[in-house]
């Protein structure tokens, strides 16, 4: 729970944190979750596989892998 006096500041901090994250991956996750309940499991798994293939070619993916190997925090660019 967040005190009423801190809601605006906390919401702004959360928005900034999300905006600095892997936004393409967030969008794919949101899409997969929204669509997953209305199709068979095999279709959901195929869609997830395709999403991972797409995301694996992004700049953000390369950034994340390099940062992980260097034990650093990644700086995502949204692509």
Question: In which residue ranges do the predicted regions lie?
Answer:
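C-terminal long alpha-helix characteristic of the crotonase
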Residues: 1-46, 53, 76-79
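Low-complexity, intrinsically disordered Gly/Pro/Thr-rich segments
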Residues: 51-52, 63-66
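Interdomain hinge/lid region at the active-site interface
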Residues: 57-61
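Terminal low-complexity tails and localization/encapsulation signals of metabolic enzymes
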Residues: 66-79
